[in-house]
């Protein structure tokens, strides 16, 4: 017996207040959620039908002011900010481009909430953190950004859980570092905290924008979801790129009077010839923090980058909505590429969904990071 068709609904909302303004019949939709990134949304809206134009879609999708929500069978699965629209008169279609709520914080700078643009010297202000848990730092970066007049888009922390990793960080006002960049840099540190901004319906039935911060990881570990090729795993790609590998990494810090601060991390047990690269963190003045960045960068480039993409069934266990970015998964494959058969652990780092314009067209593509020891 065929199940009930999956229903997608697309809502517009006011970015500042969060109030839903209308529902639009979008099609050719694709949206993605990424760990420690914003994720994207693309869709088209036909304007030739008077039943649609009466909703005044141009006003509903004003870039930088409008938000979008995606609801799947009554559950919010995506939300973000409309940044681009493009109308084409030839086919009377409006193309809409949006990015997750994290993208808003790419347009904000790490400055104290009391910063007065009319009378404050940037060189005299900073946002400091001394021996603070890194998960608290992530939450505070978002809170400080939203404490500025007109800067609150109602993203609230889901919890106050701590990671047990403390850090001392200072964000000078003169750096004008974006809040989004500060969050990503924090996550990229060795044992740095994962983060994602998602949404759910609150007790009053209205969407709630949530900042979830890992301790340090997000997601479900230890009891992985399982995808098997030929069953709930429809297809996969297996790209391996060794062009950027290195066994020795130089991390370059601030240039001071006595020269540039440099940290080096090396792995001599890869079985590969020595290769070298460098990464730049010219704003860093803390030697230990720079060493952490060097080790983190080395871990990312010490072996060929393998980022498989899995095309999975949305309607078979584990069904779409039962897993999220950060979760562990087990992949089972036996085919001409792995003729002996193999299974390996991965971590979900991206989920891209194409709902389809008709029933039965829903597609889900997962980007995963293989665990150590993957074939």
Which stretches of residues belong to each language-model region?
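Short beta-strand micro-motifs in enzyme catalytic cores
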Residues: 92-96, 207-209, 247, 362-364
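An acidic/polar, Gly/Ser/Thr-rich interaction patch typically located in mid-to-C-terminal regions
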Residues: 28-59, 229-375
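Well-ordered beta-strand positions in beta-sheet-rich domains
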Residues: 76-81, 95, 224-226, 343-347, ...
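Beta-strand-rich assembly/attachment modules of structural machines
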Residues: 1-130
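Charged- and aromatic-enriched interaction segments used to assemble
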Residues: 101-241
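Short, surface-exposed beta-strand/loop "edge" segments at domain boundaries and coil↔beta transitions
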Residues: 16-20, 49-53, 76-78, 103-107, ...
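Short beta-strand micro-motifs enriched in acidic
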Residues: 34, 85-88, 198-200, 354-356
């Amino acid at each position: 017996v065929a199940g009930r068709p999956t229903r997608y609904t697309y809502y517009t909302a006011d970015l500042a207040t969060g109030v839903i303004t209308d529902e639009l019949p979008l099609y050719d939709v694709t949206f993605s959620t990424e760990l420690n990134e914003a994720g994207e949304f693309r869709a088209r809206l036909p304007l030739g039908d008077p039943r649609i134009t009466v909703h005044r879609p141009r006003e509903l999708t004003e870039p930088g002011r409008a938000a979008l929500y995606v609801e799947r069978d009554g559950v919010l699965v995506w939300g973000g900010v409309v940044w681009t629209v493009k109308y084409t008169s030839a086919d009377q279609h409006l193309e809409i481009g949006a990015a997750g709520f994290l993208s808003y914080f790419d347009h904000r700078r790490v400055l104290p909430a009391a910063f007065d643009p009319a009378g404050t010297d940037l060189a005299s202000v900073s946002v400091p953190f001394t021996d603070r848990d890194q998960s608290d730092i992530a939450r505070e970066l978002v809170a400080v950004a939203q404490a500025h007049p007109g800067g609150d888009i109602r993203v609230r922390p889901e919890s106050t859980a701590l990671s047990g990793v403390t850090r001392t960080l200072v964000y000078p006002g003169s750096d004008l570092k974006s809040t989004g960049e500060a969050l990503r840099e924090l996550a990229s540190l060795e044992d740095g905290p994962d983060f994602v901004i998602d949404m759910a319906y609150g007790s009053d039935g209205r969407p709630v924008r949530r900042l979830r911060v890992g301790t340090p990881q997000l997601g479900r570990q230890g009891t992985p979801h399982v995808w098997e090729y030929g069953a709930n795993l429809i297809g996969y790609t297996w790209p391996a790129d060794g062009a950027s590998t290195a066994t020795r990494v130089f991390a370059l810090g601030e240039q001071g009077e006595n020269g540039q601060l440099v940290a080096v991390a090396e792995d001599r047990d890869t079985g590969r010839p020595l290769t070298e690269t460098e990464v730049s963190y010219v704003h860093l003045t803390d030697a230990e923090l720079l060493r952490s960045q060097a080790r983190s960068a080395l871990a990312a480039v010490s072996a060929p980058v393998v980022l498989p993409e899995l095309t999975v069934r949305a309607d078979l266990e584990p069904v779409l909505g039962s897993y999220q970015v950060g979760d562990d998964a087990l992949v089972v494959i036996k085919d001409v590429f792995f003729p002996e058969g193999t299974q390996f652990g991965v971590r979900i780092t991206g989920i891209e969904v194409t709902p389809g314009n008709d029933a039965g067209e829903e597609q889900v593509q997962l980007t995963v990071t293989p665990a150590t020891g993957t074939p």
